[in-house]
């Protein structure tokens, strides 16, 4: 088993004890909740006559079901209105901090917690959402959990978990122009597979990650779960501290200096032992596009849909299913695939740096005829910053719609949905069948800059041609 890693140190510091089942009872330092997976958990507490044990360690927002166009209350969707009212009432009843629409800090839960400084190194973090691993970018151990586990954390501030193995994923070198953090994680998942990380936590390391800003690191950690890993993290460093300093909930004054000293102490030791190590060369990564129905079915933008015989035997069945569903054939170049909808946003790529990169492509150009393209900022703060920088005008002048914050078309629990057999270029994290709202809709995952390029060209294209 691993030894001396950040994961081991944080795990040990938060271990309450060992349960009769053999599972570890792990204390959770920060619990993030939203409107979709929390109502049932609160109902279960009421049934048992329990209260939220640590409301001060619980933070809520609305993101999954909020519309990104008309946000007037009550919402047109009565179920969405009911769910948000339930969260409002549950937070008020339990004295939980709640960032509602119009608060100035509402947004996708995995965007607002870092920008508020709630997410910090050395924490254990849980949320009823698969992509909680995003927070690992700060050197935190962050888990997505189910509704019954949301109940457990509300009631006890602990989770019953098995300790993970730790795989070090090292990427070294400089990324080529037009290659982004999204391409890095898609390349990793493509190589190791969607089940390759099962039973592991991923430690992302190497000179490539050292050069990334915090938002890029969040993109990578966000999708660790898509590679089968339970969590993913990057050791904290000066980039981490510079991002956190001065944020709302970051330590201040002398407390800041103490915090940095402690954060430095929990980094993986130089001689840390890992259960596995995989090394990648950044120069070998190109702009990447998924062609199939899992995030692991990715190829370089100038490559072709793989032939069955090029795949591992265990991957061929899902590939055959993907050929049929996506209406693509083996050997078909992915470049030139016609697009109907272009979506820039999500907890993977809805931050200000993502919008800046997409705006560089959109500036002075226009969305191709017949393409629906829209940009959804990850939070109210991101939206405000983007508008201050004039990014909204760049997008709108180029023919993109500029929306209000929310999860939007990433998962289509809201009005933003594909129709029929439409195919989207999306900066989100999942390309499963029906993921974006239509049971027959198709999704191609790529970086925000690549989505913007597809919007301009009307088809999958190489972003490097527009740089």
From Swiss-Prot:
It comes from the Bacteria. PANTHER family: 3-ISOPROPYLMALATE DEHYDRATASE, HOMOACONITASE, MITOCHONDRIAL-RELATED. Pathway: Amino-acid biosynthesis; L-leucine biosynthesis; L-leucine from 3-methyl-2-oxobutanoate: step 2/4. Belongs to the aconitase/IPM isomerase family. LeuC type 1 subfamily. Catalyzes the isomerization between 2-isopropylmalate and 3-isopropylmalate, via the formation of 2-isopropylmaleate. Its EC number is 4.2.1.33. The gene is leuC. Binds 1 [4Fe-4S] cluster per subunit. InterPro entries: 3-IsopropMal_deHydase_lsu, Acnase/IPM_dHydase_lsu_aba_1/3, Acoase/IPM_deHydtase_lsu_aba, Aconitase_4Fe-4S_BS, Aconitase_4Fe-4S_dom, IPM_dehydratase_rel_enz, IPMI_cat. This is 3-isopropylmalate dehydratase large subunit. It comes from Nostoc punctiforme (strain ATCC 29133 / PCC 73102).
